[in-house]
Amino acid sequence: MIKTYRIYTTLLFALIQNIAMAGDLPDINLTPGSINASINQSNIQSTICVKGYTKIVRPPVYFTNSLKKKQMRDYGYADINPAHYEEDHLIPLSIGGNPSDPANLWPQARLSEWNAEKKDILEFKLYKLVCEGAVTLDDARHQISTNWIETYKRYVK
């Protein structure tokens, strides 16, 4: 019984280490971010700020699931369970990120402190600030693509 417990503990520890290896920020060489060039400050009220905009431009699940598996290999993640990641847009669709350019997508860990759910909170906050005119579109895009964690700390906490 104790031996089994030790094996499970060792396996759990190894899994946690592997998940942490995914990193909380994307590799800028693989995922530098990419914008939708048709979205700019002058047209946000008729594009990204319109309810339902992201549903129109979001790529299909079969595309993102396939890309996620490829990018998990490209990133060299030790944990290769796709369910542990969300294929996330570095520059979110809600602030005019490119929907289908692999340079704007990466497999973001779900099981870390700085996970996909936290980034979603930041994405909504930036969307509101941009649409209210409190932050420019370019500034929001730059901040989230440079270091989304620091941007989260600035605007959410």
Language-model region placement:
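Nuclease and nuclease-like effector domains acting on nucleic acids or nucleotide cofactors
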Residues: I2-Y85, S94-K157
